[in-house]
UniProtKB/Swiss-Prot annotation:
InterPro entries the UniProt entry points to: Vesicle_transpt_Got1/SFT2, Vesicle_transpt_SFT2
Keywords: Membrane, Phosphoprotein, Protein transport, Transmembrane, Transmembrane helix, Transport
Organism of derivation: Homo sapiens
Protein name stated in the entry: Vesicle transport protein SFT2A
Positions of post-translational Phosphoserine modification: 9
Function comment: May be involved in fusion of retrograde transport vesicles derived from an endocytic compartment with the Golgi complex.
GO biological process, any: protein transport
Amino acid sequence: MEKLRRVLSGQDDEEQGLTAQVLDASSLSFNTRLKWFAICFVCGVFFSILGTGLLWLPGGIKLFAVFYTLGNLAALASTCFLMGPVKQLKKMFEATRLLATIVMLLCFIFTLCAALWWHKKGLAVLFCILQFLSMTWYSLSYIPYARDAVIKCCSSLLS
């Protein structure tokens, strides 16, 4: 359990300086952070599934877009409980995942704009699909060589 705790907090086997320890310190215990991660993640999945179910109701495109986006935001925010918000933001905007992060955040915004203000149902669905793809690409950036494997797989299917 201790090794899992060190890996999730980013303290593999290195000693941190006092400033880094103060900035990364969390007032929540590891068990509390793990519980809130699970709660937030489950809520995110629930909202996404609820939004998908609402898609089939008359006029449900707007509700689908809102709940699907809220679900994805909650699932993304759940990792803040594991790493801490500052460390999560630093990792999100590292060079390897900067483009994926920007596209993902723009898809969140454009999905809500298309559904709530522009009233363009097709555009809202398109942005939800792009949201799913960008979140997948963002998530793959945390797995070593996963993006390369997906690119090779897709290129071999297309050629």
